């Protein structure tokens, strides 16, 4: 039997409204609350190597920039991912994250 998974894209899609400037505290709060609500997949933003790292934004230049977001979070149940718009993030910017 197939199961339905729920994906939340607030931190990526919502960024079109505020240039992905949610603030680190809000980013942490959104991720934590989504995980507590049982959301299966949390899209934490965009990967775009043309953008400089800014902890207050959910648009990141590489996967290593994701780590600081989780320094105060303990996410156990949700799959965490980011979207890449074709041509904006080279494969060398991607590393496996846990």
Task: Show where each model-derived region lies.
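A short N-terminal beta->alpha junction/helix N-cap motif
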Residues: 15-22, 54-57
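Glycine-rich anion/phosphate-binding loops
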Residues: 19-29, 91
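Active-site beta->alpha loop and helix N-cap motifs at the rims of alpha/beta catalytic domains
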Residues: 35, 41, 46-98
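N-terminal small/glycine-rich loop or linker at the start of catalytic domains
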Residues: 1-19, 75-79
């Amino acid at each position: 039997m197939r199961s339905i998974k729920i994906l939340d894209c607030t931190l990526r899609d919502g960024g079109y409204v505020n240039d992905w400037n949610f603030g680190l505290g809000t980013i942490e709060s959104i991720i934590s609350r989504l995980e507590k609500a049982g959301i299966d997949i949390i899209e934490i933003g965009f990967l775009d190597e043309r953008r400089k790292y800014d902890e207050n934004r959910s648009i990141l230049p590489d996967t290593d920039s994701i780590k600081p977001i989780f320094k105060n979070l303990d996410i156990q149940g949700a799959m965490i991912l980011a979207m890449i718009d074709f041509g904006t993030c080279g494969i060398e910017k991607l590393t496996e994250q846990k």
